[in-house]
Amino acid sequence: WLKGCMDYCKRFYSYNEFYIESSLTVSKTDIQSRLINLVKAYLVVRIKGQADVPHWARTTLKLLKLEKKYRAVILPAKENTIGMLQKIQHYISWQEIDTKTAKELLDKKGRRTGYKKITTEDISEAGFKTIDELATSLSEGKISMTKIKPLKPWFALSPPRHGFKRSTKHLYGQKGILGYNKELSALVRRMM
């Protein structure tokens, strides 16, 4: 009986090793580096509030300028950025950003020091000709919001009109909105 089990185990493991070696194996770092090459910038929104947040998550959220609920930032895609987003995925939601969404955020919710609306003088002071040029450079990941000096590095959003359609306590794959969310741009448009 024992010999039969050993033979079965040898055949099973040799088959699996052959299957694994012959199939395409991709590591997690390969996938992340390929994503960074495809994605230029992320739109990140903090969904959960400040209560019961552990210190490690609070410091990561502070580094990303997401200190309050319903704040949004545009982050250039880097390896450390993806790691930070995955670390605090139970408090935020993120998606790749396009130029149209970046322009809408800058038009409606962009603020400068003193919490005043952005003017053309502020954009020219930042080194851009138009708001479209600024939105394009942000969505392509060429510049970070923290580098544009008269502008605030975050956007203060309101709760979405007509409420959340999915749960705010679960990840996107579990019928929630947290973590990587494919429908975040539509949600952000309802929050502007």
List the predicted regions and their residue ranges.
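Core subunits and conserved enzymes of cellular information-processing
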Residues: 13-192
